[in-house]
Amino acid sequence: NPPGGRACIAASAMVWRMQLLPTLTTAHALFLDFDGTLTELAPRPEAVRVASGLIPTLSSLHAQLGGALAIVTGRPEADIDGFLAPLRLPLASEHGAQYRLFDTSVPATAPPALEPVLQAAQALAARHPGLLVETKRVSVALHYRLAPHLESLCHDTLVQAMREVDGVELLRGKCVFEVKPRGVHKGQAISDFMTQPPFAGRTPVFVGDDVTDEAGFAAVQALGGWGIKVGEGPTMAQHRCMTSA
């Protein structure tokens, strides 16, 4: 497509089913959450299934947008690269704690000393088999999708353990609590991308499904772009579609 031409996603149900949404063009920069947006949510993080046409569709969109497409996710970098192999896209992983524009990943945040949080989460999971502890480079996530009745216990356990760690905050997602460095969020990751080519000078669009994506919606809309919320629930995003890829 020539500059200013249309890279139309409206016909591409493999990315999302557009529902009265503005048309994406080559003047846009596209940022996509992963879980719940490009894939359906699964009981465990490793159980996510990638639709057969998703990788070629993302590759095509990346080319049509002149490289201005990035995944912005809470997952570790290795997870995304594994699910989307052999495709390697620009990526902000762990909510922006790790940042990859081209081939080299740059840690944006130093790992905090999370041992007290990790120990508390692991001890709780050992007593309740439905819980899952996920250790990332700069954070600890406690998943309770298989034990939703333990939500309050998970929350209180992590809050108590966080008192022993400086510079962290609790992030609530869909059936998960995550202890991460304070100030690290998807909005900052998107803002950082927008200062660099090929993203700079474009209108940003961010698609996400979770409360963890609200900072991303705020960032793109502050930059004159638009957010798309996938699914139900309150949001500051200007647009909504009801289904993921």
Place the predicted regions along the sequence by residue:
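Active-site phosphate-binding/coordination module
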Residues: 49-136
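Mg2+-dependent phosphoryl-transfer enzymes with acidic/Ser/Thr/Gly-rich catalytic loops
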Residues: 51, 187-245
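A common structural junction motif
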Residues: 125, 160-167
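Short amphipathic alpha-helices in soluble, non-transmembrane regions
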Residues: 117, 121, 154-162
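Non-catalytic pre-domain segments flanking phosphatase-related domains
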Residues: 1-34, 38-42, 53, 194-195
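Charged, glycine-interspersed solvent-exposed loop segments at helix/strand-loop junctions
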Residues: 131-148, 167-180
